[in-house]
Amino acid sequence: TIINVKCTSPKQCLPPCKAQFGQSAGAKCMNGKCKCYPH
């Protein structure tokens, strides 16, 4: 799931992804935007 959060590294995406999808969510930075992987 791509969320509307800008990023330069996956670490920046983990907090918003965890907030939206739970503590076990994973995150990547793709094309300057965060992509969350719910688990």
Swiss-Prot record:
UniProt keyword list: Disulfide bond, Ion channel impairing toxin, Neurotoxin, Potassium channel impairing toxin, Secreted, Toxin, Voltage-gated potassium channel impairing toxin
InterPro entries, alphabetized: Scorpion_toxin-like_sf (IPR036574), Scorpion_toxinS_K_inh (IPR001947)
Does Disulfide bond appear among the keywords?
yes
Q: Show the GO cellular component annotation of the record.
A: extracellular region
S-S pairs: C7-C29, C13-C34, C17-C36
Q: Which GO terms describe its molecular function?
A: ion channel inhibitor activity; potassium channel regulator activity; toxin activity
List the residue ranges of the region (Interaction with Kv1.3 channels).
Answer: 37-39
User: What tissue specificity does the UniProt entry give?
Assistant: Expressed by the venom gland.
Cellular compartment(s): Secreted
| Site note Aromatic residue of the functional dyad, residues | Y37
Residue(s) at site: Basic residue of the functional dyad? K28
Q: What does this protein do?
A: Potent inhibitor of voltage-gated potassium channels such as Kv1.1/KCNA1 (IC(50)=0.144 nM), Kv1.2/KCNA2 (IC(50)=0.675 nM), Kv1.3/KCNA3 (IC(50)=0.23 nM) and Shaker (Kd=160 nM). Suppresses expression of the Kv1.3/KCNA3 channel in lipopolysaccharide (LPS)-stimulated mouse macrophages. Down-regulates secretion of nitric oxide (NO) and inflammatory cytokines, such as TNF-alpha/TNF, IL-1beta/IL1B and IL6, in LPS-stimulated mouse macrophages in a manner dependent on Kv1.3/KCNA3 channel blockage. Reduces activation of MAPK and NF-kappa-B signaling pathways in LPS-stimulated mouse macrophages.
Q: What is known of its domains?
A: Has the structural arrangement of an alpha-helix connected to a beta-sheet by disulfide bonds (CSalpha/beta).
Instruction: Tell me which family the UniProt entry assigns to this protein.
Output: Belongs to the short scorpion toxin superfamily. Potassium channel inhibitor family. Alpha-KTx 02 subfamily.
Name of protein: Potassium channel toxin alpha-KTx 2.2
